[in-house]
Design a protein with these regions (language model features):
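Bacterial N-terminal signal peptides that target proteins for export
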Residues: 2-13
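C-terminal segment of classical bacterial N-terminal signal peptides
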Residues: 18-27
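Short, low-complexity N-terminal intrinsically disordered segments enriched in polar/charged residues
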Residues: 29-87, 91, 211-217
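A solvent-exposed, acidic/Ser-Thr-rich amphipathic alpha-helical stretch
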Residues: 62, 66, 82-144, 149-151
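Residue-level detector of short, conserved catalytic/binding motifs and their immediate flanks
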Residues: 71, 140, 174
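Short, surface-exposed loop/helix-turn segments at secondary-structure junctions
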Residues: 152-164
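Short beta-strand edge/turn micro-motifs at domain boundaries
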Residues: 167-200
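Thiol-/selenol-based redox modules, centered on thioredoxin-like
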Residues: 200-209
Length: 217
């Protein structure tokens, strides 16, 4: 089966970024559920189950962590809640998607749910495995893997990449900045190159070499 070339990745990233920038209204998302907010008072038992670098958190840090954990819950395939996700942000909150060809795409307002909706469209069973969590005041830093099964179409300007049923697992680093119990900024660093490789988009080294040669286009 012929797979898209590495040059196509630019188009794919553009499609992804376009999908994120436009976003999808909560009413259009796949089977959204009513938001069920977690308690701000995470217990010692709750904390013991998490991969925390330091379990001695202040009350404010526990509350901030609870907000972030709720955001992940709202982005899971079996509990997708775009509106609930947006409600966790401050009025001027921003989500920065980082790692694509464009470098950074910023989402605000009704666009904030664009990232979780975009990912759930081709990974309907999406799950985030949290590997390491560091809480420092109003900043929550998390190393994680985004996992799922390629069961939905992946839209690109060149056409649709049809689902293959492949298992997807790519690394991500998330940095959450909170203010007064709301998310002020969410920087999401996604390893798009790893994701594209698992979707079957292979590098086209020959074209890159040709383009770099004298007189190349």
């Amino acid at each position: 089966m012929k797979v898209p070339s590495w040059k196509t990745i630019t188009g794919l990233a553009a499609a992804a970024i376009l999908a994120l920038a436009i976003g999808t209204a909560p009413s259009q998302a796949a089977t959204p559920v009513q938001s069920t907010k977690v308690s701000a008072g995470l217990s010692a038992s709750d904390l013991s189950k998490l991969p925390l670098t330091d379990r001695h958190l202040t009350e404010r840090e526990r509350a901030n962590l609870a907000v972030v954990l709720q955001a992940y819950h709202d982005g899971e395939g079996d509990s997708l809640d775009p509106q609930g996700f947006m409600d966790l942000f401050a009025a001027d909150g921003v989500l920065n998607g980082i790692g694509g060809v464009e470098g950074q795409t910023s989402l605000r307002g009704t666009q904030l749910s664009g990232l979780i909706v975009f990912l759930s469209q081709f990974l309907p069973d999406i799950h985030r495995e949290l590997k390491q969590i560091t809480v420092s005041g109003d900043v929550v830093s998390i190393e994680l893997s985004i996992q799922g099964t390629f069961l939905g179409p992946f839209q690109t300007p060149a056409g649709v990449i049809r689902p293959t049923g492949a298992k997807i697992d790519f690394p991500t680093a998330d940095f959450w900045y909170l203010r007064n119990g709301k998310i002020e900024k969410f920087d999401c660093h996604i390893a798009f190159a790893t994701l594209f490789g698992q979707l079957g988009i292979l590098p086209d080294y020959a074209s890159a070499v040709a383009a770099s040669a004298p007189g190349g286009n």
